[in-house]
Swiss-Prot record:
Superkingdom of this protein's organism: Bacteria
Gene: lgt
GO MF entry, a single one: phosphatidylglycerol-prolipoprotein diacylglyceryl transferase activity
Location of the protein in the cell: Cell membrane
Binding annotation for a 1,2-diacyl-sn-glycero-3-phospho-(1'-sn-glycerol): R137
One cellular-component annotation, GO: plasma membrane
Membrane topology: Multi-pass membrane protein
Protein name: Phosphatidylglycerol--prolipoprotein diacylglyceryl transferase
Chain ranges passing through the membrane: 18-38, 55-75, 89-109, 203-223, 235-255
Keyword DNA damage: no
Origin species: Staphylococcus haemolyticus (strain JCSC1435)
GO BP term, example: lipoprotein biosynthetic process
Keyword tags: Cell membrane, Membrane, Transferase, Transmembrane, Transmembrane helix
Function description: Catalyzes the transfer of the diacylglyceryl group from phosphatidylglycerol to the sulfhydryl group of the N-terminal cysteine of a prolipoprotein, the first step in the formation of mature lipoproteins.
Length: 282
């Protein structure tokens, strides 16, 4: 099928009865790019790349499962009536906060089993996670979901965004806030900041700054969305969780500052991989 930018079909292609969605492809691309960047980062902290494979592999799998379970729990009245749709993730419906929770818990467990420092591993993968999130939001765009409230075309034009985004924000006769784009830009900016300043940070601080940065952006973007998971009629789950994560991040940051540890990336330059590499430990 031809790719039409004026209206993007959520289905990338079909193989017989099987439809492959852009949503899944983009999420997979985000994970792969994040994995590559994390592997490159290992060269500068003295860890062999094989030390990270199990952490990322199991965290990605159980994080993805947790993301779906989290979404289903907060939409249980619907899924209780339609249980056959619970595994249909290609229709969308995964919650990033659920994925983070599942991935973090799994990562800590694997780190303990492999005798790895979870703060060190967290610092290595944090830039990769936020970049993957920024890329993954384009999957929501392809699915025509996770948008904000109604706006005018003039409003979108004043944002100076590409025309194909404006046209695909025209859904069932109404233009909507491209909240996917707001969050994607915020996440990618966070990625650039983290890999630029991480060599000046102490162990554990890159990860905690990721938590704080992502949560601040998510809190404000969530307020614009029309499909939020709601705890009550006035409390959005994602905003509540974001506030909790900001507090947790600040507590960890203060603790790590009091308990001094040197920078993890003394030899790594921002966005460059040509400085002297640390001796690799297997």
């Amino acid at each position: 099928m031809l790719f039409n930018l004026n209206y993007i079909d959520p289905t990338a292609f079909s193989i017989g009865p099987l439809s492959i969605k852009w949503y899944g492809i983009i999420i997979a691309v985000g994970i792969l790019i994040g994995y590559f960047i994390a592997q490159e980062s290992l060269k500068y902290v003295g860890l062999h790349k094989d030390r990270l494979v199990d952490v990322i592999f199991y965290s990605a799998i159980f994080g993805f499962i947790a993301a779906r379970i989290y979404f289903v729990i907060f939409q249980w009245p619907y899924y209780a009536q339609n249980p056959i749709e619970i595994p249909m993730i290609w229709h969308g419906g995964i919650a990033i906060h659920g994925g983070l929770l599942g991935g973090f818990i799994t990562g800590i467990i694997v780190c303990k089993i492999k005798n790895l420092n979870p703060f060190q591993i967290g610092d290595i993968v944090a830039p990769s996670i936020i970049l993957a999130q920024g890329i993954g939001r384009w999957g929501n765009f392809m699915n025509h979901e996770a948008h904000g409230g109604p706006v005018s075309r003039t409003f979108l034009e004043n944002l100076h965004i590409p025309e194909f985004i404006i046209r695909n924000m025209y859904i069932e006769g109404v233009y909507y806030h491209p909240t996917f784009l707001y969050e994607s830009i915020w996440d990618i900016l966070g990625f650039i900041i983290l890999i630029t300043i991480r060599k000046h940070l102490r162990v554990g601080e890159t990860f905690t700054l990721y938590l704080i940065w992502y949560s601040i952006g998510r809190f404000f973007v969530e307020g614009l969305r029309t499909d939020s998971l709601m705890l009550t009629s006035h409390i959005r789950v994602a905003q509540l969780v974001s506030v909790i994560l900001i507090i947790i991040g600040l507590v960890i940051l203060i603790y790590r500052r009091i308990k001094y540890q040197p920078s993890l990336y003394k030899e790594a330059g921002p966005l460059t991989w040509n400085s002297s590499k640390a001796k690799v430990k297997s």
